[in-house]
Amino acid sequence: MILDDVYTVIQGRRQTPVEGSYVCSLLAKGKDTLLKKIGEEATEVVIAAKGGDRDQTIREITDLWFHCLVLMAEEGISTGDVYQEFETRFNKGRR
């Protein structure tokens, strides 16, 4: 799954920084900057969806998910952890 692939690249950048990498520069700026960026991206999703621009909404959701993956890597949360939470919630709702 592509989310796993992107997450793996992000983890690699954390472990072995690459000069000029956006992920590395974001991580170097600290958690507060990353959290601010996630807030900005979430707002951009809302604005795009409110405007009815499907393609822009997709792009903004992709940006939001990407930055959430960076946060997950920083916090030691794997994609598997999130998939498990989705599965738990989905299965709970099906009972």
Language-model features, listed with the residues they occupy:
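Flexible "arm" and connector segments at domain edges
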Residues: 1-61, 65-95
